Swiss-Prot record:
This is Translation initiation factor IF-1, chloroplastic. Component of the 30S ribosomal translation pre-initiation complex which assembles on the 30S ribosome in the order IF-2 and IF-3, IF-1 and N-formylmethionyl-tRNA(fMet); mRNA recruitment can occur at any time during PIC assembly. It holds the Pfam family eIF-1a. It comes from the Eukaryota. Belongs to the IF-1 family. PROSITE patterns: S1_IF1_TYPE (PS50832). Its main location: plastid. It is found in: Plastid, Chloroplast.
Length: 80
């Protein structure tokens, strides 16, 4: 059976080498940063992820310190 994953929204705080990012989750009580990597669909689509951007991240129940960035959210303050 496929492993269940949590999906959270968060804020990119730091860009690391090899498509890795530090992400601060919104709906978690503690202020821990988790390590996020970019999903293949985002890589193929050449979607730019920069510090300050809001993302959806998929976190495994077994290892809650790492996650996969699956979607970049639009900025609320832009006129798009």
């Amino acid at each position: 059976m496929k492993e269940q994953k949590w999906i959270h929204e968060g804020l990119i705080t730091e860009s690391l080498p090899n498509g890795m990012f530090r992400v601060r989750l919104d709906n978690v009580d503690n202020e821990d940063l988790i390590l996020g990597y970019v999903s293949g669909r985002i890589r193929r689509s050449f979607i730019r992820i920069l510090p300050g951007x809001r993302v959806k991240i998929e976190v495994s129940r077994x290892d809650s310190t790492r996650g996969r960035i699956i979607y970049r959210l639009r900025n609320k303050d832009s006129n798009b």
